[in-house]
């Protein structure tokens, strides 16, 4: 397998005085290039915590995370930030679009952070918005877009840098069933056409069943789910 992201014996413990809570313990995972998978589990099972660790947004108390063969624990915060910006995309339940900027300007942002020429950044952002079906909404601000359109814009922003892996935390959680299905299919389509690996945390078991692998997080441990029933 051509690994994009992996973790070994990953653990996360929260300490509050004498009370210790192990949220994750001994988690192993390998994600190949272009693979798409879902992580399911009960509320509070640590799904979001795992995604934050995989994305280098939080630090594990045990184990290692590697992105494109680079051990995150051996990188400085600046180096981790650079790796995230260059190799990873993030989509959340809430779109986190900046309300004062247009859809085009929001999607341009990661490219401008890379110090890309403004004209080229605008061209690439417009192209990605076209791919997600928002070619006619470039100059609309988030408040002028529907919930599904805002999430499509967030997906475009996450993918405009052509990351190796996209981490999505309940990306359809705020959408109605029909719109959620459309947005989920859009992510799978972009996974196929762009070759970006995709890890989706979701509580929607029907949507999870559309991915190549479904993993269940239970009592801090990750295992292949034989079924996507609750």
Curated annotation (Swiss-Prot):
SMART domains: AAA. Pfam families: ABC_tran. ATP binds at residues 41-48. GO terms for molecular function: ATP binding; ATP hydrolysis activity; transmembrane transporter activity. It is a peripheral membrane protein. GO terms for biological process: lipoprotein localization to outer membrane; protein localization to outer membrane. Residues 5-230 form the ABC transporter domain. Coiled coil: none annotated. PROSITE patterns: ABC_TRANSPORTER_1 (PS00211), ABC_TRANSPORTER_2 (PS50893), LOLD (PS51244). Signal peptide: none annotated. GO terms for cellular component: plasma membrane. Keywords: ATP-binding, Cell inner membrane, Cell membrane, Membrane, Nucleotide-binding, Translocase, Transport. It comes from the Bacteria. Its main location: membrane. SUPFAM superfamilies: P-loop containing nucleoside triphosphate hydrolases. Its EC number is 7.6.2.-. It is found in: Cell inner membrane. Part of the ABC transporter complex LolCDE involved in the translocation of mature outer membrane-directed lipoproteins, from the inner membrane to the periplasmic chaperone, LolA. Responsible for the formation of the LolA-lipoprotein complex in an ATP-dependent manner. The complex is composed of two ATP-binding proteins (LolD) and two transmembrane proteins (LolC and LolE). Belongs to the ABC transporter superfamily. Lipoprotein translocase (TC 3.A.1.125) family. This is Lipoprotein-releasing system ATP-binding protein LolD. It comes from Chromobacterium violaceum (strain ATCC 12472 / DSM 30191 / JCM 1249 / CCUG 213 / NBRC 12614 / NCIMB 9131 / NCTC 9757 / MK).
């Amino acid at each position: 397998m051509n690994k994009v992201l992996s973790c070994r014996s990953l653990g996360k413990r929260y300490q509050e005085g004498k009370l210790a809570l192990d949220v994750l313990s001994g988690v192993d995972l390998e994600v190949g290039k272009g693979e798409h998978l879902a992580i399911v589990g009960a509320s509070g099972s640590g799904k979001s915590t795992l995604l934050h660790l995989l994305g280098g947004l939080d630090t594990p108390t045990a184990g290692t995370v590697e992105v494109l063969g680079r051990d995150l624990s051996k990188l400085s915060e600046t180096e981790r930030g650079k790796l995230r910006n260059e190799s990873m995309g993030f989509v959340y339940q809430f779109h986190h679009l900046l309300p004062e900027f247009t859809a085009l300007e929001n999607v341009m942002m990661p490219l401008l952070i890379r110090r890309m020429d403004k004209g080229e950044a605008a061209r690439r952002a417009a192209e990605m918005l076209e791919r997600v079906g928002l070619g006619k909404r470039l100059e609309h601000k988030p408040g002028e877009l529907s919930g599904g359109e805002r999430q499509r814009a967030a997906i475009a922003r996450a993918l405009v840098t052509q990351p190796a892996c996209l981490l999505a935390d309940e990306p359809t959680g705020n959408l109605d069933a029909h719109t959620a299905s459309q947005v989920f299919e859009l992510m799978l389509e972009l996974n196929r056409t762009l070759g970006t690996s995709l890890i989706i945390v979701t509580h929607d078991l029907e949507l999870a069943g559309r991915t190549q692998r479904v993993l269940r997080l239970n009592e801090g441990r990750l295992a292949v789910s034989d079924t996507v029933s609750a």
